[in-house]
Amino acid sequence: MCVLFSAGATGVETYNPDVKVVIHVESPHKGTMVTWAENLQNNNVDYDILATSYYPYWHGTLDNLKQQFETVKNTYHKDVMVAETSYAYSLEDSDGHANTVRVGNNDNGADTTEPFTEQGQATAIRNLINTVNEAGGLGVYYWEPAWLTVGNTKGLTGDAYDAQVKENQ
């Protein structure tokens, strides 16, 4: 992987040396970000920012995220950020397809500290933003806020995108 990351970074730097090179890892839990940072350094990968996805029901506590960010910044001298996150505001199935977060699947547990309501969503995201800021992170990208359900799309033709477009016309 490091050979591929180095090639990608070289391509970016060749095209425009002012563009920041970001490596996005899937998870910050259980020391994953620190392990990535160590491997990237040991393999001389030239990058600027180590980013991660963060979903509390999969990736652990905000305290863990903060610790991972601080270790990467202080030990490996790289900027950090959350490149992908979201938090459900409802567990309701409104489109006939299984939700990623649903009753019996990631809807409870120690790392899910806010209810799946509009206020719970707002609080969870605000807490994440505050944690990233406290750890010296660059910021947070909310993943796909346009994924709004459009009701039951069964029976419509085309792929899911076409079905949503047709439903909303």
Segments the model singles out, each with a brief description of its role:
Residues 71-74, 90-106, 110-127, 131, ...:
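Aromatic-rich peripheral "rim/lid" segments of glycoside hydrolase catalytic domains that contact
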Residues 23-26, 33-63, 71, 78-90, ...:
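Aromatic- and acid-rich polysaccharide-binding/catalytic face
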